């Protein structure tokens, strides 16, 4: 859940291997009244209008990674403990699925996702959490679970995975792997999944490299589809375009800035700069807001 206080900043890691910050600074969520609503184990739940409070793997991961970055900066025992409570949740809630593991959303979601459903974003962020736990502890159980979490990236949606395709056949990992409707190709979810693959490559000596290369190549080719000439699109859907909210537009910029640094692909950096320039024009911000309102009137957002 995003708020008007969101400030996404990219954190570029140093050349040193090993313990590293998460690439998007989520520390603001710990200090600006963000609703974490922790359970008795110190794990956050998320409020949904339609289904009440639920465990959301991405919410748990965000809390873990926010605490991780603060821990690295301050060496706070409390933030370290908060991080490992979420690590425990990911280990305890990793569900076997064939050769892999998944983290499930245990409630129905609009558009045809039925309990339990999975998401590339949850898988990617879970991998990022466990890779950092492994780097700090060298506990092989964390790394093994992270390895197995990649399996659904290789499976098509019709096979129970999260792998979709752009019209040109390129890979797109799906945040919302709808089984009975065209894929939505949500950009930020795909990018979070790529961060997970990048982390696994770093922690596991190149494991997942083939999948990572296919995803980076596909996004490099298809990224221009998310450009609206005045703003970025949240997803690729037929009909009325869906401009990103200002928060998600800023997140796209931060994610692409990091991806440019980690892959060396110039198109990601160039696109981030172009989208940053869009944001500076009041007319673009107004057009994006109007476009988002129009899209939501015609396509109410699930909550």
Description of each model-found segment:
Residues 1-303:
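Glycan-recognition and catalytic cores of secretory/periplasmic carbohydrate-active enzymes
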